[in-house]
Amino acid sequence: MGNKLHIVSLGCTKNLVDTEVMMGKLQNFELTDNQSDADVIIVNTCGFIDAAKQESINTVLNLHDARKEDSVLVMAGCLSERYKEELAKDMPEVDIFTGVGDYDKIDELLVEKKSRFSEAVYLIDGAERVVTGSTYHAYIKLSEGCNQTCSFCAIPSFKGKLNSRTLDSIAKEVESLVKKGYWDFSFVSQDSSSYLRDKNVKDGLSLLIQRVELIEGVKSARILYLYPSTTSMALLKNIAKSEIFHNYFDMPIQHINDDMLRIMKRGFGKKQTLELLEFMKSLPNSFIRTSFIVGHPGESQEMFDEMCKFASSFGFERINVFAYSDEETTPAHEMSDKIAAKVINKRASILGKIAADVMQASLKKEIGKETLLVIDKESDEHEYLLSARKILWAPDIDGEIYVNDRSGEEELNFGAIYNAEITDMVGNILTATTKNASR
């Protein structure tokens, strides 16, 4: 076998961490962007909803069509885990199948050229990763699995119950990455606010915040995927007190109608959800991102209208919109009052337009303000523009800022933090003038 590797990571940032673990085990390979040159092709798949499943299958088949004759094609991750028997039967194009339990054994699988599905979900603990996409930012996994029983979600069926990493394991990984120059961290999991609850520790995230704040060299951090019913006011106050963790609140609430929240088995009603959101909004320099699902079985037009009104009026910074996907093994799959696909798509389009307007309004409020931003790279738009983001924002998902001017003579460096003024907006991209380097 040759030593050229082409690897594709689909789905969420949690998947990306697993992909980086595989890359860490294959550092003797040379990465190539050209699949037809690769000796080994790995696709880390997503099996969350229909669109993601189809993207995963199409990606694998397209790579098979383009690969050279003696290469090895590996299908890994959530889709492989969820449909291991069906895929092994229906996709002879794939040489090796593996699921969510053997990311750290990918080198062994390539030597053996055999498929493998370990029973336990892989939980990162000390494995060396090849962090991609940034020289200063990294995602850190808190846990695997989920103890929630949301009606629409199949993730626990293939990711299992909540299994949290120890504080020591996470701290060691952060410390190791800081030594390599990383200083900005996003903490992720299926349900971040339940971190350590499987170990009978109720305030796990608060303990994590305290621990990370002790690590010299960490300048910036945020927590993604908060779950409403396991997020306490005490946790929000601890985030607000932190000098490292931003007032960044990524909390997918999925709906706002009381009856719909009960049908979805979210464990929290409208009143409790609003109490959390209003408190988040009251905090200085807060940023609230959420997700909604449209077309869940039982969603009436009145319920949908209530969600639209709330989404447009509350003052979110960002909104993700998901069309309901009817997933086998979920309680919603067995419900009788399904919504027609045409209606679901129409509702997704309506709420999607509201989400776009919400983002525009949020961005417009930035014009004229001073902020801290970090410069990522040269812009793809023009050679004289630099691509940046507010240090508060999560990478890739919250937006891009074009730096088109500077007030001083100092050279601007990638991965550095600058004081800047937001000067204008072009489409949905802000422009900024840097003033001077910050911390």
UniProtKB/Swiss-Prot annotation:
UniProt cofactor note: Binds 2 [4Fe-4S] clusters. One cluster is coordinated with 3 cysteines and an exchangeable S-adenosyl-L-methionine.
Occurrences of domain Radical SAM core (ranges): 132-361
GO molecular function, one term: metal ion binding
Cofactor: [4Fe-4S] cluster
Residues where [4Fe-4S] cluster 2 binds: C146, C150, C153
UniProt protein name: Ribosomal protein uS12 methylthiotransferase RimO
GO biological process: tRNA modification
Record Pfam families: Radical_SAM (PF04055), TRAM_2 (PF18693), UPF0004 (PF00919)
